[in-house]
């Protein structure tokens, strides 16, 4: 009888391990869009004809661990001493940043867009939902300051995973003037829990997934908490979130705003779902951004 119980427990352990490692692989994998596919999506949803007319410079930056990040610099046709680095969302690539790039160009910024780790033209790898990605962004900030002279204002702007990455980067106290975080998550556990509720899957699978992710990839889901980077933060942050976002709930931005120590704003865009605030109400979005940046400039 004891032998049978041991065999059953052993089989259950094997099943749990298979489920856990499969779940970890699925959760941390990146279904990549091609650059052409991402560009077509942008063209179908708003005008990007201005992009082809820009002077652009492509280059790569070696991150903290030697990983190469593909970057594109969008030159403002006007003399500018303001720069912004825009981080796109999960599965997307640099073209996902274009919906924000035009706003910054119109405000007199040079714009830097890039492919996040594991996305776009970069080498395939797994996603750590802001952990490694934040260190990549820090490297880009440092590279930008060394590459371009006369920078008076440098900020970062992110959408979804890019927003979480931008917030998580604050733990390193980067030399930047502002952060714009659009529909970012405060911790990946909450996003996945929300998804499990919708699919009626047992919540306990997340803990198993987290353990297996740590074993296989070296990072647990519990480490993927951008909100922890806001403790003691004094860099101004503009949080924007679609009021009807069903994927990353607006309360993520609300919690993060409550956590930061510095100046912050939170704007919920009515009727906007995930990552579509700038498309749902571009005029309001541009006005909120312009007024926030003016307040930052007035206090520099």
Functional labels for PLM-detected ranges:
Residues 232-234, 239-241, 245:
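Short beta-strand/loop motif that positions the catalytic acidic residue
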Residues 148-160:
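Alpha/beta-hydrolase fold nucleophile elbow
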Residues 127-148:
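Alpha/beta-hydrolase active-site loop
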Residues 168-219, 268:
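Hydrolase active-site cap/lid region
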Residues 104-123:
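Conserved alpha/beta-hydrolase
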Residues 4-62, 72:
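An N-terminal hydrophobic leader/cap segment in hydrolases
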Residues 272-286:
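Catalytic histidine-centered segment of alpha/beta-hydrolase-like enzymes
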Residues 90-103, 116:
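The serine-hydrolase catalytic nucleophile loop
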């Amino acid at each position: 009888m004891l032998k049978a119980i041991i065999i059953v427990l052993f089989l259950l352990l094997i099943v749990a391990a298979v489920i856990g490692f499969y779940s970890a692989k699925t959760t941390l994998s990146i279904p990549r869009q091609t650059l052409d596919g991402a560009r077509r999506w942008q063209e179908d949803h708003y005008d990007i004809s201005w992009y082809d007319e820009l002077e652009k410079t492509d280059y790569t930056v070696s991150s903290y661990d030697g990983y190469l990040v593909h970057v594109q610099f969008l030159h403002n046709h006007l003399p500018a001493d303001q720069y912004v680095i825009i981080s796109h969302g999960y599965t997307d690539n640099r073209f996902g940043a274009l919906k924000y790039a035009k706003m910054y160009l119109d405000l007199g910024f040079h714009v830097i867009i890039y492919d996040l780790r594991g996305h776009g033209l970069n080498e395939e790898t797994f996603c750590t939902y802001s952990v490694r990605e934040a260190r990549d962004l820090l490297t880009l900030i440092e590279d930008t300051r060394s590459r371009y002279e006369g920078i008076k204002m440098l900020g970062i702007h992110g959408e979804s995973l890019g927003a979480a990455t931008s917030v998580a980067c604050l733990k390193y106290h980067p030399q930047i003037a502002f952060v714009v975080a659009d529909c970012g998550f405060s911790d990946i556990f909450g996003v996945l829990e929300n998804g499990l509720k919708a699919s009626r899957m047992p919540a306990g699978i997340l803990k198993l997934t987290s353990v297996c992710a740590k074993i296989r990839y070296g990072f647990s889901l519990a480490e993927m908490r951008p909100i922890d980077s806001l403790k003691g933060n004094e860099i101004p942050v503009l949080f924007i979130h679609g009021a009807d976002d069903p994927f990353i709930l607006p309360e993520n931005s609300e919690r993060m705003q409550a956590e930061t120590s510095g100046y912050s704003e939170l704007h919920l865009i009515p009727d906007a779902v995930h990552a579509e605030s700038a498309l749902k109400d571009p005029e309001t979005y541009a006005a909120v951004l312009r007024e926030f940046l003016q307040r930052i400039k007035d206090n520099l």
